[in-house]
């Protein structure tokens, strides 16, 4: 095949708006997929310095990916509490993993730097608009216009409205946490607490999430599934109350603070708004709506999409993105989110029942969008089946609309 000529008027072959998880993962994936030697990647990010010190990605290690070396902690047991009840589960060969943002950034940027002038990062520049043309795309930024053959848009979408219009479920997973260090050994290092619902439910679905890094140090987060964000004082008070109850007498030093907001929505995503623009990351639908997990979804997408982009660069064409998830998993997420909206008071019991009754390997796959049809049926059978069945009927219009 004859390589298309390099267009000297182009600033890059692939322009990526945003150098976060999805943008950096795709850039690395393009190199790994055999991007032509004369092709260039340009990442455009509004930050003056790229840093992931304020974020963490966690996941069940079910999918091989390029960032295994960035994993700092693995937990072979995971714990859920609801009132006086608690369950600890594990599955052979499956760990719950943590990648700190700074480790991910360091590894990704090191890999991109090794590519030399083929990869460039523009700092302190905001992408404002992307416009497809016949053989190129214009990327309008705060400092001028850039031209490329393809553009990937990882800019975060606007948070969905919390208004209930009867068409979509719009919840938010929002959290605030602290990395804490105690002078005494107070944390069980081999077990991650994914959900402790034995906390106030005054503001909606609420749990504490705990990742122990060692016996003295842990990330403790207050997490809500609700329609609106809350004042910082609510999260902080929840953490303080949990520490007083679960670790009485311990003295803690705050090492760092992190917070975040993840949309849990049934609103449809448009990952391919124009022939030469593809949305990636949250904007592309690469966050599982019912759980908020994103890391593996992004890596799966990169694995499937990067070869398509490489082929498009060689042929001079466009690259159609693969679906973010299957119609089956989309339908299940829609039903489950509708259930959480209709029955928020039942959420602690439902989540606890899932961890208690569903085989842990099956549940890990389900939460990570790696489940088989048999896995999904098992989860539905072991959950709040009558209420979920009713919610499936209520959510049928949403499911049909998303399947179009």
Language-model features and meaning:
Residues 2-42:
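N-terminal Rossmann-like FAD-binding beta1-loop-alpha1 element of flavoenzymes
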Residues 202-205, 260-280, 339-347, 352-355:
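FAD-binding beta-loop-beta segment adjacent to the flavin cofactor pocket
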């Amino acid at each position: 095949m004859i390589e298309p000529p390099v267009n000297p008027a182009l600033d890059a072959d692939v322009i990526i708006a945003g150098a976060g998880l999805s943008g950096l993962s795709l850039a690395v994936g393009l190199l790994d997929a055999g991007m032509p030697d004369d092709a260039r990647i340009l990442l455009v990010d509004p930050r003056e310095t790229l840093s992931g010190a304020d974020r963490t990605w966690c996941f069940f290690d079910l999918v091989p990916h390029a960032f295994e070396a960035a994993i700092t902690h693995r937990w072979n047991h995971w714990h859920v509490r609801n009132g006086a009840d608690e369950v600890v589960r594990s599955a052979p060969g499956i760990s719950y993993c943590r990648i700190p943002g700074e480790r991910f950034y360091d590894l990704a940027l090191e890999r991109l730097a090794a590519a030399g002038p083929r990869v460039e990062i523009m700092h302190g520049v905001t992408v404002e608009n992307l416009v497809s043309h016949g053989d190129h795309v214009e990327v309008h930024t705060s400092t001028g216009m850039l031209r490329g053959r393809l553009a990937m848009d990882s800019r975060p979408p606007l948070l969905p409205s919390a208004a209930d219009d009867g068409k979509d479920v719009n919840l938010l997973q929002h959290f605030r946490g602290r990395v804490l260090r105690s002078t005494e050994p107070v944390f069980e290092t081999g077990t991650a607490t994914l959900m402790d619902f034995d906390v106030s439910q005054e503001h909606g679905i609420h749990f504490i999430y705990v990742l122990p890094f060692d016996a003295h140090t842990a990330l403790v987060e207050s997490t809500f599934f609700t329609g609106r964000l809350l004042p910082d004082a609510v999260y902080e008070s929840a953490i303080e109350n949990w520490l007083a109850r679960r670790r009485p007498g311990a003295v803690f030093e705050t090492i760092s603070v992190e917070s975040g907001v993840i949309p849990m929505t049934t609103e449809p995503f448009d990952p391919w708004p124009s022939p030469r623009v593809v949305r990636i990351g949250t904007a592309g639908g690469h966050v599982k709506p019912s759980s908020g997990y994103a890391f593996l979804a992004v890596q799966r997408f990169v694995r499937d999409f990067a070869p398509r982009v490489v082929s498009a660069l060689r042929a001079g064409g466009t690259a159609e993105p693969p679906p973010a998830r299957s119609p089956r998993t989309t339908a299940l997420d829609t039903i489950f989110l509708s259930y959480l909206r209709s029955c928020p008071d039942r959420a602690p019991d439902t989540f606890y029942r899932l961890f208690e009754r569903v085989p842990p390997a099956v549940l890990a796959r389900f939460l990570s969008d790696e489940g088989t049809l048999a896995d999904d049926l098992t989860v539905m059978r072991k959950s709040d089946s009558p209420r979920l069945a009713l919610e499936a009927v209520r959510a049928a219009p949403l499911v049909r609309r998303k399947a179009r």
